[in-house]
Amino acid sequence: APPPVGDQAGGRKVDCFKYNTTGSAFACTRHERPVCGTDHRTYSNECMFCMLTQNKGFGVRILQDNECDIECTQYSDMCTMEYLPLCGSDGKNYSNKCLFCNAVMGSRGALFLAKHGQCQSP
């Protein structure tokens, strides 16, 4: 099957208005219920996800209701040559986490991890 495109991309949308009760500021609790965004960053809870993604300029969704399998918080433009392959939702193999995270950022959150290891060859 072809990878999802645009609005059909992985993850679920969040109704962030329920957390934005004061009009401009979010009133988030310190309650720990980690969620993983389609930007492959772990947020401490859904409200913090809303607060920190509101100004990203593109729709970050929640990929899963726990910590990310692959964390892209600290990624670099300069990647090493290490080989720890990851399979992206676009069906492409990425040689390592750094290259995968750069592709995630370039896709504006549309790309997500399909599985650890190489994608199956057709």
UniProtKB/Swiss-Prot annotation:
Q: Which Pfam families match?
A: Kazal_1
Instruction: Respond yes or no to whether keyword Secreted is given for this record.
Output: yes
Q: Which keywords describe this protein according to UniProt?
A: Disulfide bond, Protease inhibitor, Repeat, Secreted, Serine protease inhibitor
Which InterPro entries does the protein's record reference? Bifunctional_prot_inhibitor, Kazal_dom, Kazal_dom_sf, Prot_inh_Kazal-m
Q: Can you list the GO cellular component terms from the UniProt entry?
A: extracellular region
| Alphabetized SMART domains for the sequence | KAZAL
Q: What is this protein called?
A: Double-headed protease inhibitor, submandibular gland
